[in-house]
């Protein structure tokens, strides 16, 4: 009996041991088969010796650097998805091939024009043929006798002290000596090593001879090539990549020979900040330097205003060929190269070209920059991301094909970068020598021809092109890892994927410097940094004034309106002026309101054409808008400027316990997530605007959820949003899901805590007097003023007290709204004026009378005295030396502002 029990116990124990061992070895096999790929190495490298410089990348690149899969492009392909199918019935052409790329098919469906759709199809088909991109390019940076692929031996490695410690990757199915060599060449390392079959290492230093062991100790087959061996257990086959150890040049700090230098300032301008452009030119101008100015093709106002500079100054030229330079677009690199070719053809003699935008400003005197560059003639200044090239390629999207059309960068598929060259990149702000620029512009080498094809289809191409050419050309020994710039990166604010509307990618943008960032600029005093970005006077002008003082500008005490800033919103000479229906409707109503106020003073004026509209700020506080328009006064043709400002419409329930936590609760449009402001300062909204609710809570508020209700002018709930209040979400925005056109009239937005109304704000959707530049007709009114109530969600069950009107009141509001939206002509204008009076206040008027020879003489109209605009401090026509191009001092070669 006892013997039988022992046999049974032995039998079950034996089975248990076999089961445990089977499970153990199965787990090992699973771990080997699913060993992390290159995309997972980011996390593995935390325990290995490497040179992951994410902070360096964060300092210079416009790409998101957050760890983890925070972007759609970070996610692995979902192979289980159904195959994408091209909807050929939407095309008016026959595709030349079967488009296989899911990304290309998505881009074709989203593109608006048939031209763009066909361009994407044709380019995708060329790439699918396999001969579009060069497979290999030559690296012309040969400074030693190293040979690509030469095996230098088998070496014993150590876990805590790796032979090659600069990069580590694990490639379970692909690894081979050639595969690892290509990766190390791409990253710019002199040595490549394979180990344990699947592992690839790169390094800068040759392994010590004391670690060399017999070749037979490296005996594991390579998964990517069974005819090759890939090291062994802590044994490594080491190969030369053919490259030398790359060491950027260290620039000199002092100019020994004292020779002068000539700089081409390549200004690439966008937007409407004309006065800031003048301020930048005033600071940099010397008669021995050159200014070559490219203005975005869409910026008619800026180009028109700056055209006169060519006649005033022989060393200033405007680019005759203009590009639409969207964020991240391939057109940016085309523009830079075209500009460089153009000023080379002009025959200018120069020593450096430095590209700047209207958002750049010098943080050292021009003389300091001249001395520094003079001491380092021939060197090329670019800023690199760091050494983790594989991550940079992935995060920058260099392994993707992009195509620009319809001012959009479409992602259309994957690609493999050519073998044989080192990939580098970082910032697109550079300082380049004439020899290097000429080498690029001539473009005779196969390297340049190949890179041209690659970067024509690359996101943010200027952030990598110049760096990559430098690293792989005869100019590799002129590379300086410094672009002379300090950039105000605030990743939590600047990396909000705010460019998704122009590019199929998540991008980052630096923040504007404000006075609270002053320490960052002060810290550059003893560093080789000469420019900072970004600066926007519409955001913060005080910091620019402080920087001018910092670099030695000493005329501020002579400028009366030093703290004032004006920026154009509208100009009648703009090519798009006639189609700005909302702004023209709004401005027309404001000047009619002003004429009625003047009429009460016995001043009758006949209104004429609206000429210009400016935004006005003083001491970095928005003070309103200024409308410049023609008028007939006392029988004379004059120009009047009217100053007005939006009213505040915030009602708070002081019985609510959380009301004290609310700092901001208002609606606007053109919300800038990075700067946390509405770019539409005046809150001018029409039926086709995209309203956004901005809210801000104090840091002492309680956590929890709040409800936001949107009520249209007819008393109907249009949308409901839930917002969270916590310490990490103090300032945020809500965009309602309401289709165009929005119903014109007075809208309300309510904030609720459960059923308690906490705050209410109002905003105006102005009816349109014009449509496509012409007065609206009966038929057009029915289209643009009818609203989109049929698309609202069913929210009839939500009826909070003191917000949604009762049934009878709601029916009356609906009846009034239906009557209003049918108005045209004078009846429509009366409705518009009635609404605008509730939302805007007139603050003053001034006059510009060409017949009046005395600038300080007032003009009497009835009982109203008009001051001349030229002596009215708030007027856009008042003198602004800091925002006007100065006069040339022939003795110093500088521009004097006053």
Feature roles, as predicted:
Residues 2-59:
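N-terminal signal-anchor transmembrane helix specifying type II single-pass membrane topology
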Residues 74-252:
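Peripheral, non-catalytic regulatory segments
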Residues 207-210, 341-391, 755:
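GT-A fold catalytic core of metal-dependent nucleotide-sugar glycosyltransferases
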Residues 283, 288-320:
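Acidic donor-binding segment of Leloir-type glycosyltransferases
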Residues 377, 385, 389-394, 399-520:
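Catalytic core and acceptor-binding pocket of nucleotide-sugar-dependent glycosyltransferases
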Residues 454-647, 880-896:
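C-terminal catalytic/acceptor-binding lobe
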Residues 652-753, 757-762, 766-896:
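Contiguous segments within soluble domain cores/interaction surfaces
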């Amino acid at each position: 009996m006892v013997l039988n029990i022992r046999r049974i116990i032995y039998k079950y124990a034996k089975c248990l041991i076999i089961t445990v061992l089977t499970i153990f070895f199965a787990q090992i096999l699973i771990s080997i088969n699913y060993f992390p790929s290159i995309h997972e190495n980011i996390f593995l490298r935390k325990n290995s010796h490497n040179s992951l410089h994410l902070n360096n990348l964060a300092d210079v690149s416009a790409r998101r650097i957050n760890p983890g899969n925070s972007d759609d492009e970070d996610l692995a392909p979902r192979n289980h998805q159904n195959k994408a199918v091209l909807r050929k019935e939407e095309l008016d052409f026959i595709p030349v091939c079967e488009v296989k790329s899911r990304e290309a098919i998505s881009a074709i469906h989203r593109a608006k024009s048939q031209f763009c759709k066909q361009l994407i199809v044709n380019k995708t088909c060329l790439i699918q043929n396999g001969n579009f991109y060069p497979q290999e390019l030559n690296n012309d940076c040969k400074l030693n006798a190293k040979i690509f692929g030469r095996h230098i031996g088998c070496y014993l490695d150590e876990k805590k002290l790796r032979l090659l410690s600069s990069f580590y990757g694990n490639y379970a199915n692909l690894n081979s000596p050639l595969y690892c060599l290509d990766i190390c060449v791409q990253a710019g390392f002199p040595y490549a090593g394979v180990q344990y079959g699947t592992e690839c290492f790169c390094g800068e230093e040759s392994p010590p001879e004391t670690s060399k062991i017999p070749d037979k100790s490296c005996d594991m087959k390579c998964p990517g090539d069974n005819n090759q061996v890939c090291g062994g257990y802590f044994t490594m086959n080491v190969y030369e990549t053919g490259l030398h150890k790359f060491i950027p040049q260290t620039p000199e700090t002092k100019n020994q020979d004292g020779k002068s230098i000539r700089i081409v300032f390549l200004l690439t301008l966008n937007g409407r900040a004309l006065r800031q452009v003048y301020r930048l030119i005033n600071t940099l101008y010397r008669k021995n330097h050159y200014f070559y100015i490219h203005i975005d093709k869409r910026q008619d106002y800026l180009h028109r205003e700056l055209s006169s500079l060519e006649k005033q100054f022989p060393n200033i030229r405007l680019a005759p060929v203009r590009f639409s330079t969207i964020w991240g677009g391939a057109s940016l690199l085309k523009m830079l190269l075209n500009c460089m070719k153009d000023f080379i053809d002009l025959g200018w003699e120069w020593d450096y070209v430095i590209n700047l935008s209207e958002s750049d400003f010098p943080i050292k005197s021009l003389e300091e920059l001249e001395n520094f560059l003079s001491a380092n003639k021939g060197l090329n200044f670019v800023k690199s991301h760091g050494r983790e090239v594989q991550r940079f390629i992935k995060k920058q999207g260099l392994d993707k094909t992009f195509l620009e059309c319809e001012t959009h960068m479409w992602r259309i598929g994957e690609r493999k970068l050519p073998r044989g060259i080192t990939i580098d990149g970082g910032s697109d702000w550079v300082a380049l020598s004439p020899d290097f620029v000429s080498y690029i512009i001539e473009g005779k080498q196969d390297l340049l021809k190949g890179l041209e094809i690659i970067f024509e289809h690359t996101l943010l191409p200027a952030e990598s092109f110049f760096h990559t050419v430098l690293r792989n050309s005869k100019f590799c020994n002129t590379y300086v890892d410094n672009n002379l710039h300090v950039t105000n990166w605030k990743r939590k604010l600047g990396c909000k994927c705010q460019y998704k509307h122009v590019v199929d990618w998540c991008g980052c943008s630096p923040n504007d410097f404000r006075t609270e960032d002053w320490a960052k600029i002060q810290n550059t005093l003893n560093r080789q940094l000469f420019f900072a970005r970004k600066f926007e006077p519409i955001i913060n002008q005080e910091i620019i004034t402080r920087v001018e003082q910092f670099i030695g500008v000493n005329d501020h005490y002579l400028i009366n309106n030093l703290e004032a800033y004006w920026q154009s919103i509208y100009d009648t000479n703009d090519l798009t002026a006639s189609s700005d229906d909302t702004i023209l409707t709004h401005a027309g109503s404001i000047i009619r309101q002003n004429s009625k106020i003047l009429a009460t003073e016995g001043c009758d004026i006949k209104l004429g054409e609206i000429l210009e509209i400016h935004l006005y700020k003083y001491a970095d506080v928005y003070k309103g808008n200024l409308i410049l328009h023609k008028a007939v006064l006392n029988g004379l043709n004059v120009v009047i400027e009217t100053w007005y400002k939006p009213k505040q419409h915030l009602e708070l329930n002081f019985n609510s316990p959380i009301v004290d936590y609310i700092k901001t609760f208002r609606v606007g449009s053109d919300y800038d997530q990075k700067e946390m402001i509405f770019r539409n300062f005046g809150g001018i909204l029409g039926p086709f605007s995209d309203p956004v609710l901005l809210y801000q809570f104090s840091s002492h508020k309680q956590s929890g959820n709040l409800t936001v209700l949107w009520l249209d002018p007819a008393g109907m709930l249009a949308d409901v949003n839930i917002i969270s209040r916590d310490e990490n979400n103090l300032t945020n925005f809500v965009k309602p899901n309401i289709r165009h056109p929005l119903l014109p009239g007075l809208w309300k937005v309510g904030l609720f805590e459960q059923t308690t109304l906490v705050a209410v704000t109002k905003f105006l959707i102005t009816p349109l007097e014009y449509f496509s530049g012409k007065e609206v007709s009966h038929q057009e009114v029915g289209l643009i003023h009818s609203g989109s109530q049929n698309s609202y969600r069913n929210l009839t069950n939500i009826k909070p007290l003191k917000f949604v009107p009762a049934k009878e009141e709601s029916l009356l509001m609906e009846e009034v709204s239906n009557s209003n939206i049918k108005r045209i002509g004078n009846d429509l204008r009366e409705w518009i004026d009635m609404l605008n009076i509730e939302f805007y206040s007139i603050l003053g008027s001034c006059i510009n009378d060409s017949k009046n020879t005395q600038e300080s003489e007032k003009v009497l109209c009835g009982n109203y005295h008009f001051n001349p605009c030229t002596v009215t401090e708030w007027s856009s026509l008042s003198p602004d030396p800091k925002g006007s191009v100065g006069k040339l001092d022939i003795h110093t070669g500088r521009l004097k502002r006053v």
